[in-house]
Amino acid sequence: MHLDEPHRHGEPLSRDGSLERLSSTRFDVIVVGGGINGAVSALSLSAHGLKVGLVEADDFASGTSQESSNMIWGGFKYLESYDIRLVAGLCRSRNRLAAAYPTRILETRFMAVLEQGASFAPWFAALGANVYWGLGRLRTIRPRHRSKSTIHRLEPAVATAGIRGGIEYSDYLLADNDSRFVSELVIDAERHGAVVANYVKLESAELGTGVWNLALRDRSTGSTFEASAQVLVNAAGPLVSNVGT
């Protein structure tokens, strides 16, 4: 039986139900890869009303998406190479994400110290931090220059014998961790109507007349089935070249 519509919004499916939907629905988009890029793609597309399938060969967020620093940052380090346009774009993305998930992404203060042999003075680092703050549209607490004595007073655990001073600035951290964040995005995508399943491997994909025909394998049982979509998104990260092989 061919189903024109995925499950209604807010109705989670059992694994068997998800596999049945994957094989019986003509999707607008099927996303391969359940890391951060795949999860965001599935959520964004399903939130815009498209029929979306999401498959992952292992656990969701089992690859590089669970090996991050848990930071949601605006690219402060790239100011060292004066890449203003890149930092401005990263700050915009950071701000949008923080605004969309205020309980999952939290503003956090950081302190960076400069040793005696540093290539630039603390005042110059403070200037850079203020430029970073400005590129971030002043959305965080303002950065501060910190003298050696102030750092010792505020953070007595920091060894200050060989430092010149430092800066204090804000960026964002995930409230839990990266894999939890990705999993929550996958759940959000399902709430918007996406059909999701992990331990489903793409064996092959063939583009026909305006449609992708996919051969999928349920790794828990070894059984294979077919799925179809107008668009195929390969979001497998560093394994992108291995998908379907």
PLM regions and their residue ranges:
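Glycine-rich Rossmann-fold phosphate-binding loop(s) that bind the pyrophosphate
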Residues: 33-35, 57
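Extreme N-terminal leader/targeting segments of oxidoreductases
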Residues: 1-29, 44-48
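Flavin (primarily FAD) binding-site architecture
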Residues: 234-245
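A conserved short coil-to-beta-strand element within the FAD-binding core of flavoproteins
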Residues: 198-212
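Core beta-strand elements of the Rossmann-like FAD/NAD(P) dinucleotide-binding domain
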Residues: 25-27, 221-231
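Helix-loop-beta segment of a Rossmann-like dinucleotide-binding subdomain
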Residues: 152-192, 196, 213, 223-227
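Dinucleotide-binding Rossmann-like beta1-alpha1 core, especially the glycine-rich loop
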Residues: 70-154
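Glycine-rich FAD pyrophosphate-binding loop
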Residues: 46-67
